[in-house]
Amino acid sequence: LSRISKLQSINKEVGLSDHSNGILSAIISFSMGVTLIEKHFTIDNKLPGRDNKFAILPKDFSQLVESANEYNLMQKNNSKGFIKQESEVRKIYTGRWSK
């Protein structure tokens, strides 16, 4: 992650080859402008193979895709209205403190 901005000064399009455990670094990289993420995928971290130890499971992959989609939606929302997720949270807090 620390090299992304340096690489972007050379080439606008930068990807992340993520060999860390979990999906946090991949999620953080969205906000840094990364356009491609490479992440190892497995159905069982106990299977043989050196990459299986840090590969993500299907539930983690789903969460990563959902996070990427939400991030893209938030970035592209130029309207004055709220996206679905913002509206749901707004209802909770507006109701709580508006009384």
Where are these regions (language model features)?
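Catalytic cores and adjacent flexible loops of soluble metabolic enzymes
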Residues: 1-99
